[in-house]
């Protein structure tokens, strides 16, 4: 017979500790929890096999191809400190296994069937190294950080946003009114909530029209460029593009997409449309916690963030470190840097398993959003720096005097923090003092400080990994 039938251990073919990784390989770091009795080498090799060329038994057609050329390889395994029976398995994939310019195809292989594999109790993809040879096949973000600043004519500070609440139930007219008040007060952007699409109480076209009116009115009054993230997410790709086309016809600067619920194929199409038509693209990460919240299973958000930079988006939500949603400081800053820098060194203390060279792919602005208010402003300015979007939903609309004064309070707090930082003051230590000083000459800020003063913010405590 031409080949040897039967079942053999994965590790005989797919565990190759001597392998030297190539510059063109896609590298993955998996956190593997094997079932009792399964050795880690076998588990790591099984992951490499099932996410590349392998199947459960030797097949006749293996002889018609070159496994050595196409197989994934588990090239290193290390135990996870402090965890029983958990290992980091490093897997290298040859570039030819992936379709060019398709995040969808990359994920279908790397995080496809293998996650349901019986020999594993749990599996988590912690990080991916995307080689320039692959990232160069993607358009990436429609515009990137610098082009966005030029389009908006806003420099030297973080941008300010606000999600319009209540997220569901407002009519289009009242929704537009809320947008106008926030923009007039000094915000750069307002935002559709991620689940505002086109519901019976407010159809998308009506919302787009009233929000555009609000933008133009606020621009005329303030002399600043304003935007509202018009959510183009829809039930079909065709409908999504139709909404983006209408936004372009209205002349607004930015649209929005829920990239995980909408899917990577839809997102990449929208990103291409946005670059071709001069629209900025704001990305919301609804559903990410379903994938990334469990420590031992799923995918870390840094992988979803890298995937978004490939697929395309100019802003993406990235946790706050300080608000109501989860996000540890060093780890968050790790993937924030992966979003906006060209070159990020391997640094295990920040959860970065591989050095990532993005070459010239545009960067993405991280968005801090969720339970933040004026007392957080010094910390946010310090942690995220200038290249970020700070979004205060309740922290704007919850102001006792209304939306516009709420917006004023946030803008004054931000400008005060930026000025203090530029004068060399330590925002971590003097943050509360800086806000108090500014509130002496801004009654709007003083009122905001009073409302949220009980919600204490301890800056030092967040500094642990």
From Swiss-Prot:
Pfam family, one: RuBisCO_large
GO molecular function: magnesium ion binding; monooxygenase activity; ribulose-bisphosphate carboxylase activity
GO aspect biological process, one term: reductive pentose-phosphate cycle
Protein name (Swiss-Prot/TrEMBL): Ribulose bisphosphate carboxylase large chain
Note: The basic functional RuBisCO is composed of a large chain homodimer in a 'head-to-tail' conformation. In form I RuBisCO this homodimer is arranged in a barrel-like tetramer with the small subunits forming a tetrameric 'cap' on each end of the 'barrel'.
Description of post-translational modifications: The disulfide bond which can form in the large chain dimeric partners within the hexadecamer appears to be associated with oxidative stress and protein turnover.
Record flagged with keyword Transcription: no
Gene Ontology cellular-component annotations: chloroplast
Assembly with partners or alone: Heterohexadecamer of 8 large chains and 8 small chains; disulfide-linked. The disulfide link is formed within the large subunit homodimers.
Active-site residues per Swiss-Prot or TrEMBL entry: 165 (proton acceptor), 284 (proton acceptor)
Binding positions (substrate): 113, 163, 167, 285, 317, 369
